[in-house]
């Protein structure tokens, strides 16, 4: 399960905590989940899908968005920069970038270098900002000093 700090960092970047946010591509609510993805996640959770609740019920949006992000985190063996990138650009893009640039989880490339090579400026910036915000929330919520060793693995 993603940490509270990670979820807050995603929400901050996705919607700036605006529960009624709507993107130009149709993503909705706090976690800016796409309706098609939300429908699939609701089915997996055995809960009712409601497009209107994506923007009117923050807990519903967070429940679906968290489940989806957790599935990405599992797909990438807890390597959250991959899951963050996949949440923004889609899972297939991450797989192609790992194939093209190497896998930082296998020490084929440094994580920072891999992030810098992300082809889409929006996704590269997104991953960088979410990672920055994780550290802000770790300190804000827990007064926990930031540790670099093992940081990129949940």
Model-derived segments and spans:
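Catalytic glycan-binding domains that act on GlcNAc-containing polysaccharides
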Residues: 1-154
């Amino acid at each position: 399960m993603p940490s509270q700090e990670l979820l807050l960092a995603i929400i901050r970047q996705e919607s700036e905590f605006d529960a009624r946010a709507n993107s130009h591509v149709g993503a909705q609510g706090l976690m800016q989940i796409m309706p098609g993805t939300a429908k699939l996640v609701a089915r997996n959770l055995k809960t009712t899908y409601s497009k209107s609740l994506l923007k009117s019920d923050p807990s519903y949006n967070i429940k679906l968005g968290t489940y989806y992000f957790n599935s990405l985190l599992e797909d990438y063996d807890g390597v959250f920069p991959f899951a963050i990138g996949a949440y923004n650009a889609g899972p297939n893009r991450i797989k192609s970038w790992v194939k093209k640039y190497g896998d930082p989880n296998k020490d084929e490339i440094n994580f920072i270098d891999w992030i810098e090579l992300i082809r889409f400026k929006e996704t590269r910036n997104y991953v960088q900002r979410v990672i920055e915000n994780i550290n802000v929330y770790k300190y804000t919520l827990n007064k926990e000093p930031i540790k670099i060793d093992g940081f990129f693995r949940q």
